[in-house]
């Protein structure tokens, strides 16, 4: 047995302007090459664009989008008897939020558009409405889990 203690679970800090953890999680995922100030600029511009498009609280749109994209279940490859099965597993809330943010950013990067702030704001508004590539990704994951339900006992 290890003599070391268990590592404390880190909680996400909140960002300086909105005091919101989800915004900070988004910033940390969008971050490239250590340029955090640029990541903050992109997020804050996207939030302003959401405010202009929807004329509602942009943080509620962000929360609604992330809640809509967060998966309940996913599939994990598991090797059993020489063949690999896709085994459906339940996902916790923290991991689900992380996946949702990753999917939202991936879908917004693939969008055609002027800049990342514009693409991200469009994807967040679409996800809050229940459409967009990130919602499709979640539904595809749920379909895969449903199709492989027979392998659920391999956990």
Curated annotation (Swiss-Prot):
Single annotated GO MF: structural constituent of ribosome
Pfam families named in the record: Ribosomal_S7
Keyword RNA-binding included in the entry's annotation: yes
One annotated Gene Ontology cellular component of this protein: small ribosomal subunit
Protein's GO biological process: translation
Annotated PANTHER family: RIBOSOMAL PROTEIN S7
Subunit organization: Part of the 30S ribosomal subunit.
Record HAMAP family: Ribosomal_uS7_B
Protein name according to UniProt: Small ribosomal subunit protein uS7c
Origin species: Canella winterana
Lineage: Eukaryota, Viridiplantae, Streptophyta, Embryophyta, Tracheophyta
